[in-house]
């Protein structure tokens, strides 16, 4: 059964809400399928665990991280959602060979997620964190 537009939008908004501190790890587990594949792993593994490790690093480096959904495009036929998001957090640890700076750092990104049976099975994404430098 295909997910409704409202269900896909709600799943996506919950997913982006994970990129805030503190992370709701139970929600992370519920949202990501066990066979989740990160198609844009940025040098880490493509698994659910590797994605969780990347998120844990992000919120450790930016412990006051807050994220916002700026735009959503939903395709009910494929179960895919494109989301444009933004976040800001204070850099408290070394990240991408910079810092800690103690400065608020804006981060923006565009993600595409694929949802099957209410869980995210695949993710593609690109982030801009150039303001961090």
Regions found by a protein language model. Give the residues of each.
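C-terminal and inter-domain tail/linker signature
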Residues: 1-133
